[in-house]
Amino acid sequence: MRSEQQYIDLYTQARELICSHAPETMNAVRDEAFEDFRRQGFPSKQVERYKYTDIQKLFAPDYGVNLNRLEIPVDPYKTFRCDVPNLSTSLYFVVNDMVYRGEKGEVCGEKGVVRGERLPHSTPKLPEGVIVDSLANVFSHPSPLTSHLSKYYAKLAKTSDDAITALNTMLVQDGLFVYVPKNIKVDRAIQVINLLKATPSNAQRQVPDLMVNRRVLIVLEEGAELKMLFCDHTADDRHFLATQVIEAYVGENASLDLYCLEETHYKNVRVSNVYIDQQANSRVNHNVITLHNGITRNKLDLTFSGEGAECDCYGCVIADKQQHVDNNTLITHKVPHCTSNELYKYVLDEKATGAFAGKVLVEHGAQKTSSQMTNQNLTATKEARMYTQPMLEIYADDVKCAHGSTVGQLNDAALFYMRQRGISLSEAKLLLQNAFINEVIDKMQLEPLRDRLHYLVEKRFRGELNKCEGCKLCK
């Protein structure tokens, strides 16, 4: 049986159940997504954008899916902390695909809010008009604003173009919604902890390996400013498969800083698609940090729809054992006078594999485009493998574009120099690897997060970091 057939059968048999636990805005596009998924099937490695990751194999196992929206009786605020020292954030949790929010650790869902115990680290009040809530709550309460906002759902993430997006859209029942009104600046960063958990600690029965479908919709109106930090973690030693689709609309003169940090278990599979649309004179800073994982596949599609927009896209990957990390980016310059900059760095040890495929598309008429793409990689062993494919596709004649990639080992001369001065070989390698990765870390705008990442990266290279350093479950 083809790996996609089980998901086709699942939707056919459980469509009414899926729809009964989701708002109409999400249900309205579900059947179309199903038809697109059935038509496409999972992409093979012959498909250009998926050539480095075997998607069909990842989705072949029989995972359980929580379509009944059964709550796992766990208070994430009590069992899990992911604090960044000196970084003041508004803290939210997504446990599998259920959104926890508010001063009392409330659980958001289609039935409203389930209140929990008041917690000492309550989430501070957001600026007037700012919404951070579950999609189900927002779209289940009709108003002129929600009617306006519902038009953004599943518009960037086209199900006809990507089978993973189609699968997520047909199965997802809730998600996180973030809205910032015109000219509102959110000074305090929004921190979202994506926590995968299959069963409470006192469960007596065996729980199947779990598939989770997460969704995020971000809308920034003209002149709005927002910083968001996503931290992905696993709380159970089980196999998880997580699909994630993020849509972000960045209005004219708006600014979005987006950080995605992964510290998951080696049994975790994460497939994430991020779609960003930028209007005139907007700014986006997109950062992907993979410190610990099993198999990770990140896709970024960013489009310039208005002149004068800028984006900086940074990524750093540290992988060992048999971990696999695949980053695929497409930046489309549709209009003139836009600037894009990409820098991705990998350090691969043991039998880890990495892949970076980046493409910059400059369409007809997109004159005065400026674009720079760089991918640099270190392989610490002969068994480690890195695949790199930077690409430019240009249909305008007045542009400034460059791209390049390197794959190599640590500099022997530098190692020899440090050994001559009494530094051990292991410490010398650590210093060089840190210096290599720190070029990416130093470009991140949030200073407390930057300092924290320097600390976590060093611990990762020393082999002392297996899960989130702030997780109470790991103590």
Locations of the language-model features?
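Conserved beta-strand/loop scaffold segments within soluble protein domains that form the structured core
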Residues: 108-117, 125-128, 139-141, 145-423, ...
